[in-house]
């Protein structure tokens, strides 16, 4: 199997090979920053500013350093001001990081006061990643249709994974074969996502899979490359960035060649009056049924919304989490056999997996949560944009336009919140056994999926898919690093975001020491 070249590795090659261009861009940034009256968004919230270099350098330097030193800045701010609020300086604007003591007060506020979609749009440089934020249709569809349907969708998930394992994994009976775990998991999750989100017609079409996966990768690359760019330069850089330009072409291709015709065909069938026609039972159809306005119902908007939710909220994040988990097991192999024992006890017949079986994997659930605690998707969570001037209960004034968030990473590593926080204890949440101990649970001390009514709605579906994938992989395969890889591959930091190393190969071999599932 050919291992695909990582887009993140490609980013590194660009940076190393274009040093002269980068220095020219840095010079242009400095000149523009000095001559423009308002080069980036600044908030006038009266809270301390936490800097990487202290207060003796211009703001611009701290903003540029944020992309590589965000973790240090955020943890330092939390250490000093965890009961208060503080400000950090990003290349494209200021973030006000609030204490968890505001959590209950803020989580109940409506979107007209604190807007999560606008914050997500900003955080994911939405002007250049084709993200739609003009309605909550996708969130409503997940909450009203997808999550309640998970129980009856599990057989479809297992069926698609069974096919995916056959076509995506190399033959490795009695021999070690190299794979790129991120790439393999990405394709597994993409196949499952396609089965549930667009149904049987397209889900195994290789052109669809390639187009949707490339779209996912280009979103991630665009975000990674644009985050360190000052906001006033993003319109220039974003329009010439190859990954951003590719996104627009890919989006048009997917709309015109796949989803647009599929939507139109379904509408024709529905309006034909054929008594034998049954609506497809998939996410696309649910969105079509729940759309209330002409704009929401437009085929291109439906297609774009579906691509956004599958690409970033399901496929990419799940593949990253699974890669983290594999690396954790490789450097902490003492947890592997207990997980295998649990799988054999709770879910011995993988092909007959039910929702109850996956819920019963308590040890695996705890492992997922502990892996996320050490390798969260980001150090910051609960992103919101303040839509009108807001004064909090203690008098803190947040002007309209302020981008707020909370320090999810430091909170989950705080000794006041978590006992022995620097020790990886795979089953700590089984022993803890609290209402917030589940992988998908959220709370003021557990915000990696967000908090409140706009916490990640797709986390329930993603968790079941990850458990289904892991149940078979851990039971059927042995795995190890290559001979030159001794330690866990270092995570890559992109601002406050954390991603696994996606270019490290591992070696797998079909297990013969126990009965495969």
Swiss-Prot record:
Give the sugar-modified residues. 501
Needed cofactors, names only, are: heme
Q: Which UniProt keywords apply?
A: Glycoprotein, Iron, Membrane, Metal-binding, Monooxygenase, Oxidoreductase, Transmembrane, Transmembrane helix
Bilayer disposition of the protein: Single-pass membrane protein
Q: Subcellular location, in the record's words?
A: Membrane
Q: What is its EC number?
A: 1.-.-.-
Which SUPFAM superfamilies does the record cross-reference, listed alphabetically? Cytochrome P450
Which residues are noted in the entry as heme-binding?
Answer: 456
Per the record, the major location class is membrane
Provide the gene name from the record.
Answer: penP
GO BP field: mycotoxin biosynthetic process
Q: In which pathway does it act?
A: Secondary metabolite biosynthesis
EC top class, in one word?
oxidoreductase
GO CC, alphabetical: membrane
- Phenotype on disruption: Abolishes the production of penitrems A, B, D, E, and F as well as of 13-desoxypaxilline, but accumulates the early pathway intermediate paspaline.
Q: Which InterPro entries does the UniProt record give?
A: Cyt_P450, Cyt_P450_E_grp-IV, Cyt_P450_sf
- Report the protein name in the record: Cytochrome P450 monooxygenase penP
Give the family from UniProt: Belongs to the cytochrome P450 family.
A molecular function (GO) held by this record is:
monooxygenase activity
Answer yes or no on keyword Transmembrane. Answer: yes
Disulfide-bonded cysteine pairs: these are none
């Amino acid at each position: 199997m050919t291992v695909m070249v990582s887009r993140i590795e490609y980013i590194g090659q660009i940076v190393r090979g274009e040093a002269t261009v980068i220095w020219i861009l840095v010079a242009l940034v400095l000149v523009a920053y000095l001559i423009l009256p308002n080069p980036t968004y600044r908030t006038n919230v009266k809270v301390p500013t936490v800097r990487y270099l202290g207060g003796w350098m211009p703001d611009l330097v701290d903003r540029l350093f944020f992309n590589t030193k965000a973790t240090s800045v955020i943890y330092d701010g939390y250490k000093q001001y965890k009961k208060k609020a503080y400000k950090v300086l990003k290349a494209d604007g200021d973030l006000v990081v609030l204490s968890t003591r505001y959590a209950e007060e803020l989580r109940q506020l409506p979107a007209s006061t604190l807007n999560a979609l606008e914050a997500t749009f900003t955080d994911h440089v939405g002007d250049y990643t084709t993200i739609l934020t003009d309605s909550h249709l996708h969130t409503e569809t997940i909450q009203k249709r997808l999550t309640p349907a998970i129980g009856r969708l599990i057989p479809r998930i297992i069926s698609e994974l069974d096919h995916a394992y056959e076509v995506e994994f190399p033959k490795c009976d009695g021999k070690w074969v190299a794979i790129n775990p991120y790439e393999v998991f990405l394709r597994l999750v993409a196949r499952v996502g396609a089965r549930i989100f667009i149904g049987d017609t397209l889900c195994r079409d290789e052109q669809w899979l390639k187009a949707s996966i490339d779209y996912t990768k280009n979103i991630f690359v665009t975000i990674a490359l644009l985050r360190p760019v000052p906001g006033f330069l993003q319109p220039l850089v974003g329009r010439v960035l190859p990954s951003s330009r590719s996104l627009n072409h890919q989006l048009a291709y997917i709309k015109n060649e796949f989803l647009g015709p599929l939507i139109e065909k379904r509408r024709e069938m529905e309006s034909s009056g054929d008594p034998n026609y049954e609506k497809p039972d998939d996410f696309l159809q649910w969105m079509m049924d729940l759309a209330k306005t002409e704009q929401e119902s437009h085929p291109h908007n439906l297609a774009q919304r579906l691509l956004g939710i599958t690409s970033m909220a399901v496929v990419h994040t799940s593949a990253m989490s699974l890669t983290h988990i594999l690396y954790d097991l490789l450097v902490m192999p003492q947890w592997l056999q207990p997980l295998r024992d649990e799988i054999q006890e709770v879910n011995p017949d993988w092909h007959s997996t039910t929702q109850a079986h996956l819920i019963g994997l308590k040890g695996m659930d705890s492992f997922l949560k502990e892996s996320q605690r050490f390798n969260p998707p980001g150090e910051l969570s609960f992103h919101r944009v303040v839509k009108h001037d807001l004064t909090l209960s203690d008098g803190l004034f947040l002007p309209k336009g302020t981008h707020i968030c909370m320090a999810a990473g430091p909170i989950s590593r705080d000794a006041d919140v978590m006992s022995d926080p620097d020790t990886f204890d795979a089953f700590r949440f089984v022993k803890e056994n609290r209402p917030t101990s589940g992988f998908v649970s959220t709370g003021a001390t557990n915000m990696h999926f967000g908090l409140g009514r706009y916490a990640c709605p797709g986390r329930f579906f993603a968790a079941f898919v990850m458990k289904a994938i892991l149940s078979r992989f851990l039971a059927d395969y042995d795995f190890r690093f290559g001979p030159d890889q001794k330690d866990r591959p270092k995570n890559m930091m992109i601002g406050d975001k954390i991603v696994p190393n996606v270019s490290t190969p591992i070696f797998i071999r079909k297990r013969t020491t126990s009965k495969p599932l």
